[in-house]
Regions:
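C-terminal membrane-cytosol helix-exit motif in multi-pass small-molecule transporters
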Residues: 2-12
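12-transmembrane solute porter fold
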Residues: 16-185
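Conserved small/polar residues in nucleotide/adenosyl-binding loops
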Residues: 190-191
Length: 191
């Protein structure tokens, strides 16, 4: 955090900054970046935690666990081009909002999972999450690129990629922290 603060202060003072912070003046750009960060962080949680739930808690074999997990990318594969096409014809903000709403719904769906849940429930939740991520991603990327001047397209794309990669790191770190804290509690390794 300290280095990030120093970076921001330096970028504000230099004549030719590495990252022109002026692009963040657009509320739509900033919100789209924050939403990308949020959504990819959330995506990493299920990618990290669900295999442990399916294999270690539910005692499913790797094959069945993998087949269940396939619901997410298959749904995303189907939804992404359809959402991109829809976003070209209607308001991208609405399509993005639908995607975000579906992601929130899928996360609430995980609250329904218990030790006796049928595998189809996990598949349905993953389908909703995958479709929602597919619906969200294309129009959100377009919003990010449309909200900046043409001369900042490279920077906007880089910030978008940075947000995605930071989300992968953040989501993986938080998910593994939660996982290993939960796994350590029964054997008294935390305290």
């Amino acid at each position: 955090f300290i280095l990030f603060g120093i970076f921001i202060l330096t970028e504000k003072k230099v004549a030719q900054p590495l990252l022109d912070l002026g692009i963040f003046k657009s509320k739509l750009f900033s919100m789209s970046i924050i939403m990308a960060l949020f959504n990819f962080t959330v995506a990493m949680f299920s990618s990290i935690l669900l295999p442990f739930y399916l294999q270690d808690f539910r005692n499913y074999g790797p094959g069945l666990a993998g087949m269940i997990m396939m619901a997410y990318p298959v749904a995303m594969l189907i939804a992404s081009p359809l959402a991109g096409s829809a976003a070209d014809k209607m308001d991208k903000e609405i399509v993005t909002f639908v995607g975000i709403s579906g992601i929130v719904l899928s996360q609430l769906g995980y609250l329904l999972i218990n030790p006796h849940s049928a595998p189809w429930l996990v598949v349905v939740i993953l389908l909703i999450q995958g479709m929602s991520m597919g619906i969200f991603q294309s129009p959100n990327n377009a919003l990010i690129m449309e909200t900046v001047d043409r001369k900042y397209l490279g920077i906007a794309g880089s910030v978008n990629s940075l947000a995605r990669n930071m989300a992968f790191v953040l989501g993986t770190s938080l998910a593994t922290l939660i996982l290993f804290t939960a796994m350590s509690n029964p054997v008294s390794y935390t305290h």
